Amino acid sequence: MANLNWSYEGENGPEHWSKLYPIANGDNQSPIDIKTKEVKHDASLKPISVSYNPATAKEIVNVSHNFQVNFEDKDNQSVLKGGPFTGSFRLRQFHFHWGTADDHGSEHTVDGVKYSSELHIVHWNSEKYSSFSEAAEKPDGLAIIAVFIKAGQANPGLQKVIDALSSIKTKGKKAPFANFDPSLLIPQSSDYWSYHGSLTHPPLHESVTWIIYREPISASSEQLAKFRSLLSTAEGEKASSILHNHRLPQPLKGRQVKASFK
């Protein structure tokens, strides 16, 4: 893997991303702080419907600033529908963001409240575009489900992911990751917020319709600590842990956040 020209700290940290990626100062950047008093209920927002085939889970990869679980996305075996969308969006991958301690780590915040971590389940508009990379640059290209994670009880649905981390300890490591349904990690309550935003790390494309569930899921402190035990460095390099990988909330710049609930 090429060396990253951006990071989460120091001279290539988030406050400097705009030097390499001017869109970092754009009008539709993510994450944001959701101010619940300013949110508008939108009766046209339908319930979110996900249908994921566990057989499409493929591999888990350490990408240096994070890890992700990738899915086979050649056809519509795993899709997201409903919500603000007319068509279906194909599942591509999921990943998490976290902080140095359990009292912060989520990227989105709610009335300033931070959660311990945040899950992002990434989908692309396969009805309109022919690949993830093409869709990622288009305003209507991506749909990302965000789920807040609160430190508390251990989450059995998360354990398979946690157990796989030891096999991808260092940057560039991959391991097979089969038979997993990420809908296990979606909260029971269907209440969500939605707005138009961006990827939360470079290239920061403003191509994302966000679906942010109101209800958090839980993970234990032990489970969350395993995220921080991953290394951003390759085997043989001086070890450096991925202690945090979250961007701070960005200005709303006139955007309207909508709620599926009153």
Swiss-Prot record:
Cofactor: Zn(2+)
Residue ranges of coiled coil: none
Residue intervals of the Alpha-carbonic anhydrase domain: 4-261
EC number(s) given by UniProt: 4.2.1.1, 4.2.1.69
GO cellular component entries: cytoplasm
Pfam families reported for this sequence: Carb_anhydrase (PF00194)
Chain positions recorded as Zn(2+) binding sites: H95, H97, H120
Active site residues per record: H65 (proton donor/acceptor)
Keywords for the protein's UniProt record, in alphabetical order: Acetylation, Cytoplasm, Lyase, Metal-binding, Zinc
Modified residue annotations for N-acetylalanine: A2
GO molecular function, one term: carbonate dehydratase activity
Residues binding substrate: T200, H201
Localization: Cytoplasm
Catalytic function, reaction form: hydrogencarbonate + H(+) = CO2 + H2O; urea = cyanamide + H2O
SMART domains named among the record's database cross-references: Carb_anhydrase
Regulation: Inhibited by acetazolamide.
Family per record: Belongs to the alpha-carbonic anhydrase family.
Family annotation (PANTHER family): CARBONIC ANHYDRASE, CARBONIC ANHYDRASE 1
Function: Catalyzes the reversible hydration of carbon dioxide. Can hydrate cyanamide to urea.
Entry protein name: Carbonic anhydrase 1
Organism per entry: Monodelphis domestica (Gray short-tailed opossum)
